[in-house]
Each structure stands twice: as C-alpha cells, then as structure tokens.
C-alpha cells in the first residue's frame, strides 16, 4: 500500500514545475515519476513478458473479441479515410488502435497495405494481435505508449521517413469507459484506477493515489489545468475534507463527494454539446485521468514521433476530444512553441511573432516562438463530426479532427 505522505513528497517536484510555468506538463516530468526515464529502464526486461501475457489473454478470450470491438464505435471514419487517402502498397501507423475500428476501415478501403497497430492498453494490444491473425500480411501489432513508439518502431526495423500516413485517435475508448473495473467512468462504480496500462506498470499511481495524496492546492491546480474546472478550489476542498474521514477508493464515491460540494440543482445543471445534462464531476474525472496517464506529455511525444517517421508528403490525422489536446495539436502543426502560455490563442501568438519580426527584434527570440512550418494543413479549419455521426455515437459529439501533410 502506498504511504501517502511519501507519495506526496515524491510528486512535489512534478507539481511545482508545471504549476510555476502555468502550462500542462509538456516535457517537465521529474526523474522521480514512475513513467519517465528511470521507469523505462525496466521496459526492455518487461517487453517480452507483456507481449506473452497479452497473447495468452487474446487466446483465452477469442469468443469475447467481437463483443469487445463493438463497444467502441470509430469516430468520423469517412473524414479519416478522406484525409489519409490510403493507396495500394502504402504503409501506415495507427498510434491508438483501441478496438481497431479505424484500422478495419482503412483495410476495407485498401487491403494491399501494411499497417502498424500501436496501443498502450494490453487489452487493445490483444485485439490487435487477434486482427493480425486475420490479416497476417497487413497488421503488425505493437504494445507501448507514444513515448515508447520510436524505440518499438526502430526495433521492428522501421526507419524514419517510412510511413505514408499516421492516425491518432486520442482520449479514452468506449472499451475503457464501459469496463467498471478500469475505473474510468463515474456512472459505473468500480475501483478508482484510471490507468490505461496499469497492468504493465503496477507501481504507476492510480487515480485513488492522486486524490488521497495531493494537498488541496495541488488538487485544485490539476482540476483547473487538466479539466478546465472553474470550481476547482471548491471541489479540491471537498475532496480533502472527505478523505480525512475515509480514503477515497471508488469511482462513484468520488463522484458523490464532488456532487456534495454543490446544491442538488447544480449536479446535472451543465449541458454537453447535445444539450444533455452532464454530471458535475465529469471534468474532475477528466482532469485526474489526464494527469494519471500523463496524456498531454504523451501526446506531444507522439506528435514528434509521427513527424519523424512520416515521409515527406505523408499525412497525419489527429482526432481529439477536448480543448487541451486540440490546442497542442494545432500549435504543433503551426510550429508554435509549447512553452507559450496556453491562454494565448494561436492567432494572438502569430500576430505577436509577426510584430516581433517587423520590429527587427531578436531573430532568435522569434524563431523560438515559431519554428519553420513543417506541415501543410489539409483543411484550414478543424473538422467536426456530422450530425449522423453524433446520432450513431453520442461520444463523438466533442470530436475535432485536424489533418496535415508533412513538408
């Protein structure tokens, strides 16, 4: 069992880095965190064991695969296929295989391709392995995080500049949300876990560790930064008060604590994009999940890997489901530094850079603020799902698609 005071001290450096900078944790995780370089030294030793366990899992669950795959409906399939434009003989990388919905659609569009299917979730990897048995010449299953992708690809003999297209479908999959034991959903009671690959890294902190260990200020910062929660201080205070009585270990327990900080009329007062009522704890769950899985830092490293392994003229398609992800993708494609304040819009940043250049100020400063463009946008504006997409899959309502061609 984790000793919470020690856990809190261990994360002190991590919190101070991004709290002082005012931006999400992009490249600032300290050496003490489990998911960084120190922990990755164990990766080589674990890799074979992980893959063997996943293979055993998929052999023992063959009958369940079709059901599992149906849990996740791929989003904006037509738009993804249009932007990737798969052609005979091309090579692709799906960096978020999930249940394989997009991969299958690509294969249906053009079967004479090779597709590397990556996912950090061992359950998704097992599905990819199963699909590779059906398409042995096309599918290459890979288990790992975005930050491990470069190593995995190089070990598989894939050289930089190889891929004709890379797909990223970010966020939490329906398979994860609909499995109470994973602890992602506030609507289904389960252990407060939220780790996408906790089975591979048992020492990786869970959502329960986060809400029980961090002080009130740190919790509020997590909720405000990763959940864009305007009531972050109030919710953090409620969490700290509740855990002083008993540890917070279940998803619906946390949801009830958050709800208890507000009058009953406010619990479902918020509306989603479909004007449906959403629980007041939704943003809290999002924030904790993003923090636990280091999702924004992983996204940035995934984008860099995609750029490195795409050939000139290769296409990147990225689907995001909240504004923080979309902002990172947009800035990356426009060559704007991730160290700039996130409350400064891309338009403001471009204007600011132009003003610096026109005044003949420090050219090095200008180049730091905006790197040379490496991408040509396929669509100038972000794409949103069609009404039919949202009707078929309400979870697609917040999807945003950005696509670009590597120059």
Curated annotation (Swiss-Prot):
The keyword Acetylation is assigned to this record: no
Known EC number: 2.1.1.-
Enzyme class: transferase
Subcellular location: Mitochondrion matrix
Positions where Phosphoserine occurs in the chain: 358
Residues annotated as binding S-adenosyl-L-methionine: 100-102, 119, 146, 169, 176
Protein keywords: Methyltransferase, Mitochondrion, Phosphoprotein, S-adenosyl-L-methionine, Transferase, Transit peptide
Gene Ontology cellular-component annotations: mitochondrial matrix
Catalytic activity: cytidine(839) in 12S rRNA + S-adenosyl-L-methionine = N(4)-methylcytidine(839) in 12S rRNA + S-adenosyl-L-homocysteine + H(+)
Keyword Mitochondrion: yes
Biological process per Gene Ontology, one example term: rRNA base methylation
Physiological role: N4-methylcytidine (m4C) methyltransferase responsible for the methylation of position C839 in mitochondrial 12S rRNA. Involved in the stabilization of 12S rRNA folding, therefore facilitating the assembly of the mitochondrial small ribosomal subunits.
Protein name: 12S rRNA N(4)-cytidine methyltransferase METTL15
Biological source species: Pongo abelii (Sumatran orangutan)
């Amino acid at each position: 069992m984790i000793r919470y005071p020690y856990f809190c001290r261990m994360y002190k450096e991590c919190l101070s880095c991004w709290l002082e900078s005012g931006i999400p944790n992009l490249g600032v995780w300290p050496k003490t965190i489990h998911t960084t370089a120190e922990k990755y030294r164990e990766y080589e030793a674990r890799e074979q064991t992980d893959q063997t366990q996943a293979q055993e899992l998929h052999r023992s669950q063959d009958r369940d695969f079709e059901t599992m795959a149906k849990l996740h409906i791929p989003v904006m399939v037509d738009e993804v296929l249009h932007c990737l434009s798969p052609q005979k003989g091309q090579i692709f990388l799906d960096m978020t295989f999930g249940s394989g919905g997009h991969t299958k659609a690509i294969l249906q569009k053009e079967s004479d391709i090779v597709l590397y299917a990556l996912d950090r979730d061992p359950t998704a990897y097992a599905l990819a392995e199963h699909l590779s048995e059906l398409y042995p010449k096309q599918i290459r299953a890979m288990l790992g995080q975005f930050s491990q992708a470069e190593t995995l690809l190089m070990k598989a003999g894939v050289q930089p500049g190889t891929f004709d297209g890379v797909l990223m479908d970010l966020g939490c999959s329906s398979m994860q949300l609909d499995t109470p034991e994973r602890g992602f959903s506030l609507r289904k009671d389960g252990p407060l876990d939220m780790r996408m690959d906790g089975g591979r890294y048992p020492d990786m902190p869970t959502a329960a560790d986060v809400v029980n260990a961090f002080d009130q200020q740190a919790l509020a910062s997590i909720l405000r930064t990763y959940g864009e929660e305007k009531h972050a201080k109030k919710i953090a205070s409620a969490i700290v008060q509740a855990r002083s009585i008993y540890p917070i270990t279940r998803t619906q327990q946390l949801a009830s604590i958050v709800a208890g900080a507000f009058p009953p009329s406010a619990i479902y007062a918020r509306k989603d994009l479909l004007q449906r009522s959403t629980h007041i704890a939704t943003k809290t769950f999002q924030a904790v999940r993003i923090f636990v899985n280091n999702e924004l830092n992983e996204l940035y490293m995934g984008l860099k890997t995609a750029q490195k392994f795409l050939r000139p003229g290769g296409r990147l398609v990225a689907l995001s489901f909240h504004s923080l992800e979309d902002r990172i993708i947009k800035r990356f494609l426009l060559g704007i530094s991730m160290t700039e304040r996130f409350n400064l819009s891309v338009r403001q940043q471009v204007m600011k850079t132009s003003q610096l250049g026109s005044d003949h100020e420090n050219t090095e400063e200008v180049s730091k603020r905006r790197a040379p463009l490496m991408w040509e946008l396929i669509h100038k504006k972000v794409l949103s799902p069609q009404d039919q997409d949202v009707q078929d899959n309400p979870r697609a309502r917040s999807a945003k698609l950005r696509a670009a061609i590597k120059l």
